[in-house]
């Protein structure tokens, strides 16, 4: 038998959870059915389910700061919508900071602040409203530069 979602949550927290505690953590990412607790981490889980389980392992630790690097990668649009709801809920109940790194414009809907980087350097920081206004007024400030082929 392989590693289960329950095993993974116990490893993530560093303590022995009971199944009710594990289910409570999973419910925070939209996996509230008790069936997920005993599921094996294998091909039977969708990409969206795996992403939410991955996020649940972070939430389970109750961090002061959580960093998610391109959490939307490899998931479909429906799973993406669920993922944005998870981040909105996480923001409302968390006392810490959640940093989401993404190249996808659609992730902007969950942002409080937006940081623009260019070639690894800080270009601009501002509120979502301020930065979206900048992007709309000066779209070239945020365009991806295509590599020139010789």
Question: What are the roles of these predicted feature ranges?
Answer:
Residues 2-18:
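Q-loop/switch helix immediately C-terminal to the Walker
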Residues 19-36, 40:
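Conserved ABC ATPase "signature" region
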Residues 70-71:
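Walker B catalytic motif
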Residues 86-100, 108:
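Conserved catalytic loops of ABC-family nucleotide-binding domains
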Residues 54-55:
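Hydrophobic anchor residue at the start of the ABC signature
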Residues 109-116:
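Conserved catalytic segment of ABC-fold P-loop ATPases
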């Amino acid at each position: 038998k392989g590693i289960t979602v329950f095993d993974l949550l116990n490893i993530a927290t560093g303590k022995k959870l009971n199944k009710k505690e594990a289910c409570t953590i999973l419910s925070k990412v939209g996996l509230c059915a008790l069936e997920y607790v005993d599921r094996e981490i294998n091909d039977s889980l969708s990409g969206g389910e795996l992403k939410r389980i991955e996020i649940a392992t972070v939430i389970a630790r109750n961090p002061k700061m959580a960093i998610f690097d391109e959490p939307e990668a490899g998931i479909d649009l429906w799973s993406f919508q669920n993922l944005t709801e998870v981040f909105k809920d996480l923001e409302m109940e968390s006392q810490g900071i959640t940093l989401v790194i993404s190249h996808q414009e659609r992730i902007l809907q969950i942002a409080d602040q937006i940081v623009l980087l260019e070639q690894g350097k800080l270009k601009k920081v501002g509120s979502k409203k301020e930065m979206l206004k900048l992007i709309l007024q000066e779209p070239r400030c945020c365009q991806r530069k295509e590599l020139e082929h010789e």
